[in-house]
From Swiss-Prot:
Functional description taken from the UniProt entry: 3'-to-5' exoribonuclease specific for small oligoribonucleotides.
Protein name in the entry: Oligoribonuclease
Family: Belongs to the oligoribonuclease family.
Species of provenance: Burkholderia ambifaria (strain ATCC BAA-244 / DSM 16087 / CCUG 44356 / LMG 19182 / AMMD) (Burkholderia cepacia (strain AMMD))
GO annotation, cellular component aspect: cytoplasm
Domain of life: Bacteria
Location within or outside the cell: Cytoplasm
Exonuclease domain sequence ranges: 20-183
Keyword Nuclease (UniProt): yes
Pfam families assigned to the protein according to its UniProt record, in alphabetical order: RNase_T
Bridged cysteine pairs (disulfide): none
Gene3D superfamilies the UniProt entry points to: Ribonuclease H-like superfamily/Ribonuclease H
Residue spans crossing the bilayer: none
Root EC class: hydrolase
Lineage: Bacteria, Pseudomonadati, Pseudomonadota, Betaproteobacteria, Burkholderiales
Amino acid sequence: MTDTAASASQPALVRNELNLVWLDMEMTGLDPDNDRIIEIAVVVTNSTLDIAVEGPVFAIHQSDETLAKMDDWNKSTHGRSGLIDRVRASTVTEADAAAQLQAFLAQYVSPGKSPMCGNSICQDRRFMARWMPEFERFFHYRNLDVSTLKELCRRWQPAIYKGFQKRAMHTALADIHESIDELKYYRQHFLIPAASAPAGESAPAA
């Protein structure tokens, strides 16, 4: 029922309440009341992003009627990636995926501890609250949204902002890894401690 399972060869990740759960979905559109989830993946990292463990990746079955309602961009993007064919062939429901993902995550972090991590993650959370409500409650109510740093960097440090180029694969697992890489980039180039600031710049007074 899973397309991709966690690899036994990956570095061991110790269960810890500071571990971070990264998540991404692909949907048929942007409206959680009328559109549906068609792919979901999770990755768990330690708090410093040094160790990552991939969870299952699920294509969620949806009817041909639902898929036909997608706009041209979604049909083209998800058709080109092969996701539409995977969705048609899948027998996994939202409930199936949610139960298996929650069981996987419980190995690494307790319910209610990890924020939901990703890019524009509030959109994923809206869909999860609509179609996977029990799974949504597994997460802390806070989000760790990399797009917040993206928007600040674009306004405050545009040269640094332009230094990270997204591949825009629009598959759930690839997008998660890209979000983690993007946060690492901002940590190195944008979130610079005062002691490491360029010469001539001083930290503001407390």
